[in-house]
Every structure is written in C-alpha cells, then in structure tokens.
C-alpha cells in the first residue's frame, strides 16, 4: 500500500492487479436529484477528463504505469458528510432508530469502534462516552439545502488526504448564518470560523497589522500559526479588563 497525500492518490495490489485511486481536491457532486432505490455498488459513467490530472501524477510517481494499460476504469460514488464526521446515534425525530452512516471512506477502519459504541448506546440508552463530534443530532436543517450540499461536497472528499492542520476551517458554503454583530466584527478585523453554520469571530487582526498588508486569514501550519500573537493580546485584554463575546 502506497499513499501520496500531496498528490491525493493511493496505490495498492487488488485481486492480482494494480489499483490506483484518488481523493481529488475538487470533487464532483452526485445524487443531487435523488439516488435510485435499486442503486447498489453500481458504476457511474467514466470521466477521464476529471481523472486525468490524477493519472498524470500517478504516471510520474510510478513510470511503469505509462505502459501498463488500464484494465478497468471504475467511477463510483462515495458518501461524505458536510463536516467529514460520521452520522452516529439515535435519529432525533425517530425513537429507537439508530444510524451509523457517512463514514467518509474510513468505514472499514472505524467499524469496530463505531459498532461497539453504537451497541453500547442502544443497550444503555445513552452514549457510552462523549460522541457529540459524530452525533447525528448535530446536523442542522440548512445542511440539507441543495446549494449548500453542492458547494460543500466539492471540498469534503479532498480533505481526507489534505493536511489536517489545527483549527482548519471549511472554505465552501460559508456565510449562511450571521449574527447582528457580524459586520461590526468584520470591520474590527475579525477572522471568522464556522460553528453550526454560524460565522463566529475566532480572532482579530490588529489595525497596525492590517496597515502592514496582513489579512485576517488563517495561515495554517503545524507550528505556531499567524494568529497566535493576536490571540495572546486578546487574552490579556480580557483577563486584565473586560471583553464581549458573540456566541451565536
């Protein structure tokens, strides 16, 4: 098994053949008009143009692929949730109906733990430990909007192989819920994150930094990120004086 996250690809032996798969950065939404009742492990129409950049990178990574030929080009759908986390637990509007779905292509490796947790949940009447990050009840009605799903689904698949930086924010389907203070916070230099669809100020860019040409945007890193010093200043201001937080 070979994974190359920077190229969104994985390679493995499969039934005596060599399989190349990918989690591309700009996925194509499918099923927006509904999924047929009889759809089960079916194949979608081939889309060589969409896969071509992935294939070119694969040939560059493993030159032998240039002469290997393609035995089967399989284009199939995969289920990804709007926040790349499971849908697990008792359905909020249907008593004793439990769900384990939306595993975002990590279902096999998650099956043992998720199955155990769900079984204990069903038996004990409550989650065996804090599972809110994957609890189906976190989903909101607006996340069933066609427009929202089309935009967000293009992003979520590619994030599987992207760097999972701390505090990483979704880039698509944003700005859906804004508090009455939103524009005031934005004018004050706020950098927004998303909480249940709400735009929430995570930190503020000081005026002098803005004058130097800096922007109120995350610069993701595994090290100390660009907002750390600004958050330190905010922390001291609240600790030593007073602060007002918009918790919408």
Protein language model annotation of sequence segments:
Residues 6, 15, 29, 37-177:
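C-terminal catalytic lobe of FAD-dependent flavoproteins
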Residues 8-9, 242:
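A generic local secondary-structure boundary/capping motif
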Residues 10-12, 18-22, 200:
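Short hydrophobic-aromatic micro-motifs
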Residues 17-22, 98-99, 212-217:
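Short, well-ordered strand-loop elements centered on a beta-strand within folded domains, enriched
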Residues 20, 69-70, 99-100, 194, ...:
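General beta-strand structural signal in soluble alpha/beta enzymes
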Residues 23-35:
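Catalytic strand-loop segment that frames the active site of acyl-thioester-processing enzymes
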Residues 129-248:
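Glycine/proline-enriched, intrinsically flexible loops and inter-domain linkers
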């Amino acid at each position: 098994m070979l994974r190359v996250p920077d190229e969104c690809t994985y390679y493995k032996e499969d039934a005596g053949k060599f399989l190349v798969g990918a989690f591309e950065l700009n996925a194509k939404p499918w099923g927006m008009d509904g999924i047929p009742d009889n759809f089960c492990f079916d194949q979608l129409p081939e889309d060589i143009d969409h896969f071509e950049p992935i294939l070119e990178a694969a040939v560059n990574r493993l030159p032998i692929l240039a002469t290997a030929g393609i035995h089967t080009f399989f284009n199939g759908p995969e289920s990804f949730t709007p926040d790349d986390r499971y849908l697990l637990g008792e359905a909020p509007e249907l008593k004793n109906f439990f769900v384990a779905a939306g595993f975002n292509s990590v279902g096999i490796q998650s099956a043992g733990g998720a199955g155990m947790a769900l079984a204990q949940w069903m038996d004990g009447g409550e989650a065996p430990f804090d599972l809110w990050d994957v609890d189906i009840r976190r989903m909101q009605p607006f996340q069933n909007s066609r427009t929202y799903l089309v935009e967000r689904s293009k992003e979520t698949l590619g994030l599987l192989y992207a760097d999972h930086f701390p505090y990483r924010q979704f880039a698509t389907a944003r700005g859906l819920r804004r508090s009455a203070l939103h524009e005031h916070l934005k004018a004050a230099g706020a950098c927004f994150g998303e909480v249940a669809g709400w735009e929430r100020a995570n930190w503020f860019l000081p005026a002098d930094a803005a004058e130097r040409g800096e922007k109120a945007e995350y610069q993701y890193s595994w090290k100390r990120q660009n907002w750390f010093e600004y958050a330190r200043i905010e922390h001291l201001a609240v600790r030593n004086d007073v602060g007002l937080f918009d918790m919408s």
